A protein has these predicted regions:
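PLP-dependent class I/II
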Residues: 1, 25, 29-34, 49, ...
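Short loop/turn segments at secondary-structure transitions that flank enzyme active sites
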Residues: 17-19, 52, 175, 301
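Short glycine/serine- and small hydrophobic-enriched flexible loop segments
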Residues: 47-55
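Non-catalytic terminal extensions of PLP-dependent enzymes
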Residues: 58-316
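Hydrophobic side chains in beta-strands
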Residues: 11-13, 48, 134, 171
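Active-site PLP attachment segment
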Residues: 1-28, 34-45
Length: 316
């Protein structure tokens, strides 16, 4: 991320159809939303960021990637950290059929750093090497608890993204070796405290810890497939494509006469589905983490989606 003020942004236009297809509409929209008296501190910071990318961008990004690789190496090679933490590799997150390059990890203890350019050139999906996904379920804590109670409240480390059993560390061009060293030091402290607690734990407490770890790492709720849009919100063009009109469904939800409320805690929705009713979502349902919608307006609610929602132990 260039060192521009956060309120600033750039629109990158590099498309062969831009000039002939949308240039006039783009400028019309731009002039509608822009100000004739912009904040020149923001404008200046954007210009400095552009200059930085042009003159020293490659070097800064290279150091950023090296910092992320050094973090992976430090965690994977530390005997105590390996007991409770695991850096997720490419093979852990991308199925083999989508990795034509055959690369399983950007770094491993035997071969060191792998050439990630092959993955970027050949694979259908590739991971951002500057972001490190750390599995923390081995500590017995879910990602959100580990983020808030351990990293933020106790050690002052700010992160944004979590899942049921992972946290995501995002490096940037300002990441220093000392910040990486501090993070590793914190993880070692956490592992040492866990070791001490387990040494003093009773057999019953140990079993409870093992159950929590097993629940977080192995009993993951199956992610449901997208069901379908209700026929009332499908395109009637005869193409048979699965698209739906979310806008129509969203605003129809404001008509109370068209809506019915069901509790998630009981089996009333399953009973309605078994009786032949099609239940349709009126809004976006976005549990965080992970932060993506599992229901959108106009989508038919399936039993698999209901089971997934009940299995989630999220805060938002």
């Amino acid at each position: 991320t260039p060192t521009a003020l956060r309120q600033g942004s750039m629109i990158h236009v590099h498309d062969q159809d831009f000039k002939g297809e949308v240039e006039d509409a783009f400028h019309e929209a731009y002039m509608t939303h822009t100000s004739t008296s912009p904040n020149y501190q923001i404008i200046a910071s954007l210009d400095i960021g552009r200059r930085q990318v042009e003159l020293e961008g490659f070097e800064l990004v290279q150091k950023q990637v090296e910092s992320a690789m050094a973090m992976r190496k430090a965690i994977d090679s530390h005997p105590l950290l390996k007991k409770y933490f695991k850096v997720l590799k490419v093979s852990d997150m991308i199925p083999k059929k989508h990795r034509q390059s055959g690369i399983e990890s950007y770094w491993d203890p035997e071969h060191g750093w792998n050439d990630i350019w092959d993955a970027w050139a050949e694979d259908e999906f590739a991971l951002d090497a500057t972001r490190v996904t750390l599995a923390v379920g081995g500590t017995g804590l879910d990602g959100d608890t580990f983020k808030n109670q351990i990293l933020m409240d106790k050690y002052g480390i700010q992160i944004n993204k979590t899942s049921r059993n992972t946290v995501l560390f995002m490096t940037n061009i300002g990441t220093t070796r000392s910040s990486i060293a501090y993070l590793i030091e914190v993880l070692v402290r956490v592992a040492q405290e866990l070791d001490g607690d387990l040494d003093e734990a009773s057999p019953m407490e140990r079993k409870g810890f093992e159950r929590r770890v097993h629940h977080l790492m192995n009993e993951l709720p199956p992610l449901p497939d997208f069901s379908r849009f209700h026929d009332a919100f499908r395109c009637a063009d005869g193409t048979g494509t699965p698209e739906g009109d979310i806008r129509q469904a969203f605003f129809l939800a404001y008509d109370e006469a068209q809506c019915e409320y069901f509790p998630l805690e009981d089996d009333s929705m399953e009973e309605a589905i078994d009786a032949g009713r099609e239940l349709v979502s009126t809004s976006f349902i976005i549990p965080y983490p992970p932060g993506f919608p599992i229901l959108v307006p106009g989508q038919v609610i399936s039993k698999e989606i209901l089971h997934f929602m009940r299995a989630l132990d999220v805060k938002e």
